[in-house]
Amino acid sequence: MPLGVLLTAIVGLGALSIDMFLPSLPTIAATFATSAATTQLTVTLFLAGLAVSQLFWGPLSDRLGRRRVLIAGLTVYTLAGAACAFVPGIRALIAARIVQALGAGSGPVIARAVVRDLYEPARAARILAGMGTAQALTPILAPIVGGWVHALAGWPAVFLVQGGFGAVFLLTASGVVPETNVYAGAPASEPTGRRLATLLGHPRYLAYVAVAALMFGGQFAFITGSSFALIGVLGVSPTLYGFCFAAVATGLMAGNFVSVKIGQRFGIDAMLRAGTMIGAAAGLLMAALAWVGVASVASVIGPMFGFAFGLGFVLPNAAAGAIGPFPRMAGLAAAVLGFVQLTGSALYAVAVSQFHDGTLRPMASAIAAAGVLALTASGRVRKT
């Protein structure tokens, strides 16, 4: 497996771990006789663990190197993923998912840091967008595969498959990942706290992080709410749900593909602005349809395709713009970006889940609000 393929795969490790078992959420809730909100904690707390762990893996990779840190993280992910299949109750499943997330956090932060190690910002944005195009296959295929595995062998088998993927990535990383951090092993020029203060005092860095976090928050409101909206409210089957989710992921793939083709011509900031404009318009359309009483698969998936298309512009360009100016602390810069993006999304999704009322309105309104706020935040990038 070439290095680029592995980096693309591990960037999507979190998405794989979430999207693959989304069709199983209602069954897991029924199996353990618990509520939808409690079951959704297996998603939202996974996301929180994924976010927090990046603050550990990123700075550690700045000091010790990318390769060793990635191998350690993938080992944790593989073992915890398999353990999820054998839990006796919902609390144990939530705990195992948190540990799985701690390992998964090594993937995206190390992959982005490696790209920064190897390329300057404009080229890095193109590389990340290209990785995103391929990575978008994860949310397309994962729910479909998860739905099939669930139908054939039950939800525990979904986690065994995740553990198997982790083992493949671990063995591959051991063979193909070089050490790209030229500063690995050198004494730190300044303490981590001071380097963190440098990042948080950089207005453009904060603006890029805010845009990425807000747009991803809208996407995650769909990720956590879509199974209950589409299966619970609209009555689609778990298998059909997988194809609906895949249609949205196709929007993300298309956005990434277009970003690869035109991103270097227009620049990071212009692509960011365009992506947030598309996201805001799509979110407002979904909310308007929900509030006038239109409740159909098309009224959800159509606008969400557009939102995901805009997200495909935003994520690679926000990451390249945020991490690019900090070559000596690319791991920390990538970690803070990932932490804010994922923690904000988890908190947003938890808040949205509390307003579940058996309609599409809470989810649609949350997606619209995220798009509008991201558009507003993108204006700060232009002013700093």
Predicted regions located by residue number:
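Helix-loop-helix hairpin linking two adjacent transmembrane segments in secondary transporters
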Residues: 92, 121-122, 129-175
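Paired small-residue
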Residues: 76, 80-83, 91-99, 298-304
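Structural signature of the two symmetry-related core transmembrane helices
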Residues: 68-82, 163, 271-286
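A late C-terminal transmembrane helix in Major Facilitator Superfamily
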Residues: 321-357, 366-367
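Conserved MFS/SLC helix-loop-helix module at the cytosolic interface between two early adjacent transmembrane helices
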Residues: 52-91
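Cytoplasmic helix-loop-helix junction between adjacent transmembrane helices
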Residues: 96-136
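Helix-breaking motifs and short loop linkers at transmembrane-helix boundaries and internal kinks
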Residues: 31-33, 65, 86-92, 103, ...
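Juxtamembrane intracellular "pre-TM" segments in multi-pass secondary transporters
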Residues: 180-209
